[in-house]
Design a protein with these regions (language model features):
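Collagen-like Gly-X-Y triplet repeats in extracellular proteins
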Residues: 1-191
Length: 191
């Protein structure tokens, strides 16, 4: 009833991470597990697991980070943030996975906010090496009825910077979220 959701486990190489568990009545949603890194050329990194949802007073769990891609492959997408409880914000989206010469994984979408709370921030796009493209930032989560949408995530850095994410929609009485910053070009990104 009052417990937090359990965290999702990490994925096997190239596999999706486990989803975070839902929270009890007043607990926080569990964080999503990280996607598995790929060591095989051409194989995409695993996607991050989704964050667990909260019920009443707790925030949604954060999405897991995407795994790094094998040589020439894209990084895995970040997991989506869990929905926030009635009075709490949505979880942030997970980071996109790193790619050496491919495209960094997209950042995860922020979780929706509860009735009176803002949406979660979108995850940062995955970085890439100098020959790759940074991942797109995640979309901000939608705001609750009386709250603003979450900000979009920043684009990942790389040979070409990734586009910033879109801000989340505001609730009926809330403002929309700000868009994310574009990623830095001609830069070796990190995970």
């Amino acid at each position: 009833m009052i417990g937090n959701g359990g965290a999702g486990g990490s994925g096997a190489p190239g596999a999706i991470g486990g989803a975070g568990g839902p929270a009890g009545l007043i607990g926080v949603g569990g964080a999503g597990g990280a996607g598995g890194d790929s060591a095989v050329a051409g194989v995409i990194g695993g996607a991050g697991g989704a964050g667990g949802a909260a019920l009443l007073f707790g925030a949604g769990g954060a999405g897991g980070a995407g795994g790094s891609g094998g040589s020439g492959a894209a990084g895995g997408a970040g997991g989506a943030g869990g929905a926030g409880g009635l009075f709490a914000s949505g979880g942030s989206g997970g980071f996109g996975g790193f790619a050496s010469t491919g495209t960094g994984g997209a950042g995860g979408t922020g979780g929706a906010g509860g009735l009176f709370a803002s949406g979660g921030v979108g995850g940062t796009g995955g970085g890439a090496g100098s020959g790759g493209t940074g991942g797109v930032g995640g979309t901000g989560g939608a705001g609750g009825l009386f709250a603003s949408g979450g900000a979009g995530g920043a684009g990942g850095s790389g040979g070409t910077g990734g586009a910033g994410g879109t801000g989340g929609a505001g609730g009926l009485f809330g403002a929309g979220g700000a868009g994310g910053l574009g990623g830095q070009g001609n830069h070796t990104g990190g995970h």
